[in-house]
From Swiss-Prot:
Lineage: Bacteria, Pseudomonadati, Myxococcota, Myxococcia, Myxococcales
Keyword terms of this UniProt record: Ribonucleoprotein, Ribosomal protein, RNA-binding, rRNA-binding
Record protein name field: Large ribosomal subunit protein uL18
CDD domains in the record: Ribosomal_L18_L5e
The species this protein was found in: Myxococcus xanthus (strain DK1622)
Coiled-coil region(s): none
Keyword NAD: no
Amino acid sequence: MPTKIEARLKRKNRIRKKLSGTTERPRLTVYKSLKHIYAQVVDDTTGKTLAFASSLSKDLKGQDEGDKKADAKRVGALIAQKCKAANVEAVVFDRNGFPYHGRIAAVADAAREAGLKF
């Protein structure tokens, strides 16, 4: 019986077979650890990271530290802001094998509210 991590990696690989970011619509991938959340926008055709944000970012350090879900919302808004600065309007959302719930959904919703198209 696979462990939780092995099952997530299996889901991740199954999703990544079908999901790929292009220059027009790069891939917004999200990773969460027990304490922090990370988001990056990747152009898979060139293999370059176009934008990156995490709950450890210096841009978010001065803000009031709340719960993890509030941190995820701030990361979603920050990644959308950095995408606009990099002239990225639309992305493909890669949940990285995590269930679309809680902090993962909070990042996606905040990015949508900030004007990023999925």
